[in-house]
Amino acid sequence: MTNIEQSNEKRQRSQAVTQTEWEQYMAEKILRLIRHELYMDFRYMDVALSALSYQPKEGIDTLGTEGDHLFYSADHLLRVYPKNPVYLNRCYLHMILHLIFCHPWLQGSRNAADWDLACDIMIEYLIDHMEQTSVQRITGLLRRKVYKRLESVG
């Protein structure tokens, strides 16, 4: 056992933590890993990627923000990350891009559902065309059709 491992083991024994505390710790570790992976592909977004402070919020099945905090469910992150880390990378970047483009604040008198859908489609279009490893996924037929139609409109 290395000195670092011994030190970590000693620290863990002296700091009894609850299951909930451990889950929060691991969830925030996952969020830092996601942010780091995105940073490796999008170095120019370093300030934006680190602008939100993490805030646990149980009962949500995705990531969320109001512009200051990144809301997450530890249970959701711990369940999804091992199976599909790219999905979480995309969710994180999706939120950041919404904030960069000021989507939450530019709705005005537009229909909220239509505005949200239009902004989501635009953000996903951008992410799908970034062609970076951290967010790359297979583009399904429906997405390709929607993108082709949008591109033809102009």
Feature locations, PLM:
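Short, functionally important secondary-structure microenvironments
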Residues: 1-89, 96-154
